[in-house]
């Protein structure tokens, strides 16, 4: 998925608004994903999946950090997330569809907290970005 210059600007703009809330939004994204797509819980059998659990917050922080890393290296997402791609493909063996679920839930969280920022154009750019992140994380499955 190729991000245009406008897409990159839109994505960076959204993440600048997210600012210090990235970890909170990461946890909220996971909670939403576990409720909307309960099959995703199978990868977290050892987690307390209750609202506000320390484990969800900690993993949400990791998710947020990976997304921020991807934004910071938006011209080389594959390089920025290479180790994470290896982990998910070779060790964790996460079903690739789960990255789509995560991306969708992240878009919902952004829409809830920043409805004015999520214009149709920004929505499309953020969706393309999340698809690009998902593609990178599943690229080494082959």
From Swiss-Prot:
Taxonomic placement: Eukaryota, Metazoa, Chordata, Craniata, Vertebrata
Expression sites by tissue: Red blood cells.
Chain segments annotated as coiled-coil in the UniProt record: none
GO cellular component: blood microparticle; haptoglobin-hemoglobin complex; hemoglobin complex
GO biological process, one term: hydrogen peroxide catabolic process
Keyword Metal-binding (UniProt): yes
Protein name: Hemoglobin subunit alpha-A
PANTHER family: HEMOGLOBIN FAMILY MEMBER, HEMOGLOBIN SUBUNIT ALPHA
């Amino acid at each position: 998925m190729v991000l245009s210059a406008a897409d990159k600007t839109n994505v960076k703009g959204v993440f600048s608004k997210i600012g210090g809330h990235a970890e909170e939004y990461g946890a909220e994204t996971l909670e939403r994903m576990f409720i909307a797509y309960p099959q995703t819980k199978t990868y977290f059998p050892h987690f307390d999946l209750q609202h506000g659990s320390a484990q969800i917050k900690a993993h949400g922080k990791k998710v947020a950090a990976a997304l921020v890393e991807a934004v910071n290296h938006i011209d080389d997402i594959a390089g920025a997330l290479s180790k994470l791609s290896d982990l998910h493909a070779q060790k964790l063996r996460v079903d690739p569809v789960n990255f789509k679920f995560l991306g969708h839930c992240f878009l919902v969280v952004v829409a809830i907290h920043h409805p004015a920022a999520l214009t149709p154009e920004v929505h499309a750019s953020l969706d393309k970005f999340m698809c690009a992140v998902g593609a990178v994380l599943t690229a080494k499955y082959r």
